[in-house]
Amino acid sequence: MASTSTAGDRIKKFLGIPADERLNDTACYVDGSFVESEPTTQDFLNEIRPTVQGTLNYLRELFPFVNWIFHYNLTWLLGDFIAGVTVGFVVVPQGMAYAKLANLAPEYGLYTSFVGFVLYWAFATSKDITIGAVAVMSTIVGNIIANVQKDHPDFDAGDIARTLAFISGAMLLFLGLIRFGFIVEFIPIVAISAFMTGSAISIAAGQVSTLMGIPNINSREETYKVIINTLKGLPNTHLDAAMGLTALFGLYFIRWFCTQMGKRYPRQQRAWFFVSTLRMVFIIILYILVSWLVNRHVKDPKKAHFKILGHVPSGFQHKGAPRLDNEILSAISGDIPTTILVLLIEHIAISKSFGRVNNYIINPSQELVAIGFTNLLGPFLGGYPATGSFSRTAIKAKAGVRTPLAGIFTAVLVLLALYALTSVFFYIPNSALAAMIIHAVGDLITPPREVYKFWLTSPLEVVIFFAGVFVSIFTSIENGIYVTVAASGAVLLWRIAKSPGKFLGQTEIYTAPRELVRGSKDSGLTQSLLQKSEHHTAFLSLDRDDLSNPELQISTPWPGIFVYRFGEGLNYVNSAKHLDNLTIHVFKHTRRTELNKFEKLGDRPWNDPGPRRGQAFLTDELVSRPTLRAIILDFSAVNCIDVTAAQALQDLRNQFDRYAHPDKVEWHFAGVSNRWTKRALVASGFGVDSLRTAKVQRENHKGGVQEVDQGPLVAIGPSVSASDIEAVPVGTSGSGSTDEKRPEGEGGATNGGMEKGSANGEDISTVPTATSADACALARDAGGKRLVPVFGINRPFFHIDVATALKSAVRNTGVVAAE
């Protein structure tokens, strides 16, 4: 470190940067003392430098299955088999239905689902999630294909979908590998709910025409136009409506019936759950049978009595490398952000939700690796963009899945369908598939009770919710995504910029016995109970806007001392607002130290012109105000500050020093937990004593003025035994000499005092450090534990909490309360 420091000093000297004495702690070094060292660039590089163990952990995280695969057992196997087969029965008809939403042949849905189930288990951090074709993503892909083919009619729909999946997968895989999974935290629940609700309404509205057999309805238009055109086309309803409406009714009836039977017969609840889960399979088999009876002599699907699925090729007929030429890449480039955003929203939201329900934590970065890898390799077998499915994940979780390996059993079932059941799929009615889609997306609509909960929690976000839904309905799903995410980001910035700070007052809080809480009318009993109860000083808002009891007595901390708590960080966005509020409040409740500073009216600044002509300047109210002595900033909600905020604090300090001249305003900081924040404050001149001697005038408790030398801070370190403690010089506090007697109970944490805690981290106290005898007495507490400083003695104006900071500020002002 010495060479690094020397090199840094040489660079500073070469560039003409003066040495900052505030960062020079040599005057504070005493053997046995705890002195804080400033974090350096080398420290930062050491923190982010990869280590051997870190690299091994990273590789282990890439393949999380190694943590559980060697513990696999028959019980897990049975649970995975049941869940995997159950999901397999659902995913086969769903996959083909969703492929139709994507403007693709039905087999593409099976390809996509197969790849997701085969690959996901090796990279999964969620046992419940299922990756495959989903309704919302399929609709987005269908819209993209339709838009691209308008300008490039020669492009094959399958090529567009596969290329889109490959590029999106590569980007997601990259984000996952560099561990950028935290970006999903920028998308709030309200934005996700609005997106899912708007998408579900759009998808359901687009499927009504297929359900009813209404021809010539463009389901790719804006949702409101689709609804209007569908209503206009009701007179043109065909026989498909009989198949579709009865299928939709059957799906809802079976679910309702199984739910009721599960409630009536709790012991058979699991059996009724499996019956409900397989309702899609029952409906598809039933309507395949009906369709075969009606159309068994039909060879051309166009000649069927109602629209049917038609030929589904067996096996993987669209395998091969995706198309990656410049022409197709430029055509889909504008739609890649939307695709990535939808993949992220659906997958991470679903996996987090089920992780909380089933008591495990997912790794968002690893989930990005999983869906990225799936979408990167899926196109080689004919897959299009795949992500997590809410309905299938819910089924899988309720079916008793034990590990992610259940996806293998689902993949086997999909593979069996691809090679053995494609001839049966010929007779599936399109209206029955539409009924399945409507039934599936209906669960994605946010219920009114949830919207009402949003309203109770944050009314502004309800506006964002409805804005996203309406934009999705009246424009497109893609625009709905952008609006909700952008609006949520704007609200976040607005809340940071307008985060309210609070001026704090103090009150005594008692741990009250039950008799006192119930309200005893006996004052003697009340006093007796209060004396027995524990109490401490708490700091609450002076504005009383925190819903505290209006009868609670909250007093100002001390005349001329102000405690300010930041509400939500301190940065370039909100620093001006916070410090303006601080300035206005201080000027309103204090006076200048020199009342007659301006001898003539013309000497006064324009923004402080004083009273009108003929009115007295020194009013009784003004004279009675205290002078500004200290500012205490509660940094418990501040993690880091930037250059703008630091400069604003420096400017405010200079302004207050001019206001309090010839006194100097002390700045105390409580709850600073980030060492880089402390470094920034120290570099700005806060938190440390001046290393040069300064003349400071203070009012003593008798009303006189006392001029004292404020010397450099000297460390005091209590030793383990009394024999090890030697007398050392103590810096004055600016309110008297070192041997001045302090009033009891006003232990300071700066120049004349130190914050100390027990070596085992249990007890914390504020103690004066005046003489070696005092240090000898304070080396151990009543329990015999060795006392050590909480923070470095070279940073005396940083305190562990507001109460300690206030004690220090009161002590250093030299003001003694009247007995």
Swiss-Prot record:
Pfam families: STAS (PF01740), Sulfate_transp (PF00916). Residues 551-708 form the STAS domain. One of its GO terms (biological process) is sulfate transmembrane transport. Mainly found in mycelia. It is found in: Membrane. One of its GO terms (molecular function) is secondary active sulfate transmembrane transporter activity. Glycans are attached at N24, N581. One of its GO terms (cellular component) is plasma membrane. It is a multi-pass membrane protein. The chain crosses the membrane at residues 72-92, 104-124, 129-149, 172-192, 194-214, 273-293, 328-348, 365-385, 454-474, 477-497. Induction: Highly expressed, but only in cells subject to sulfur limitation, and it is turned on by the positive-acting 'Cys-3' sulfur regulatory protein. It comes from the Eukaryota. Residues 726-766 are annotated as: Disordered. Keywords: Glycoprotein, Membrane, Transmembrane, Transmembrane helix, Transport. Residues 746-755 have a biased composition (Gly residues). Belongs to the SLC26A/SulP transporter (TC 2.A.53) family. Uptake of sulfate into the cell. This is Sulfate permease 2. The gene is cys-14.
